[in-house]
C-alpha cells in the first residue's frame, strides 16, 4: 500500500524495486489530501499498477486537478472504517489547508500504523487516534527558524505557520 503519490512516478517505481516490492503486490494508494506534493504522480501510478485503486474522500477527489480514471477511484467517508484486502483503514480528520485532509490508521494482525502528514497542529482527536500506534509516521515539514529565514514569500510563511499548516 502506498500513502500518497507526490514524488515522481519513476522514483515511486524505483523505490518499489529497490525494496523488493512487486508492483502486483501494491494493493492501493491512500490519498491524504489534494496538494500537488501529495498527488503529482497519482494518474501514472494508478495507470501502471494493475491491481490498485486510489482512495480519497469525496471533497478531496473534487479538489484533485490531475485526472484519475473513474475505475481506479474509490471514495470513503472520513471517520468511517473500510477495508483494503486484510487491512482495516481508519481515515481521521486533520487540520490542514486542504478540502478535507485526513490521516490514516492502518490495522493488520493486531498492529496499528498511523500516518499524519502536513498537520497544522496536533489536536486531542489526533492524539487519541495515534496514541496506541505500533508505528507512527508523522511528517514534520518545517522548522520555524529555518522557515522564517528562508526564501518563501511572506504570505506562504504565514500560511505554513498557521493553525492549518
Where are these regions (language model features)?
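Conserved beta-strand hairpin/beta-sheet module of binuclear metal-dependent hydrolase folds
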Residues: 1-19, 102-118, 135
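Active-site neighborhood of phospho(di)ester-bond hydrolases with catalytic His/Asp-centered motifs
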Residues: 2-6, 27-34, 55-58, 114-118, ...
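Active-site metal-binding motif and surrounding structural segment of the metallo-beta-lactamase
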Residues: 9-56
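Short amphipathic alpha-helix with an adjacent loop that forms part of the alpha/beta core around
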Residues: 16-20, 82-86, 126-129
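Active-site environment of divalent metal-dependent phosphoester hydrolases
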Residues: 35-39, 61-63, 98-99, 121-124, ...
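Metallo-beta-lactamase
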Residues: 56-110
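Active-site glycine- and acidic-residue-rich loops that bind
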Residues: 115-127
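Cap/insert and terminal regions of metallo-dependent hydrolase folds
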Residues: 125-165
Amino acid at each position: 500500500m502506498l500513502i500518497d503519490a507526490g514524488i515522481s512516478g519513476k522514483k515511486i517505481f524505483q523505490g518499489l524495486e529497490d525494496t523488493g516490492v512487486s508492483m502486483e503486490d501494491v494493493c492501493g494508494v491512500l490519498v491524504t489530501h489534494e496538494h500537488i506534493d501529495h498527488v503529482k504522480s497519482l494518474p501514472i501510478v494508478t495507470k501502471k499498477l494493475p491491481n490498485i485503486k486510489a482512495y480519497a474522500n469525496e471533497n478531496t477527489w473534487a479538489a484533485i486537478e490531475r485526472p484519475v480514471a473513474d475505475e481506479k477511484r474509490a471514495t470513503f467517508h472520513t471517520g468511517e472504517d473500510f477495508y483494503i484486502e486484510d487491512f482495516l483503514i481508519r481515515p481521521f480528520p486533520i487540520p490542514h489547508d486542504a478540502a478535507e485532509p485526513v490521516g490514516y490508521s492502518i490495522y493488520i494482525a493486531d498492529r496499528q500504523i498511523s500516518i499524519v502528514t502536513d498537520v497544522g497542529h496536533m489536536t486531542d482527536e489526533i492524539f487519541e487516534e495515534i496514541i496506541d500506534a505500533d508505528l507512527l509516521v508523522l511528517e514534520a515539514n518545517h522548522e520555524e527558524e529555518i522557515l522564517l529565514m528562508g526564501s518563501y514569500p511572506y504570505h506562504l510563511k504565514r500560511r505554513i505557520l498557521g493553525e492549518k499548516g
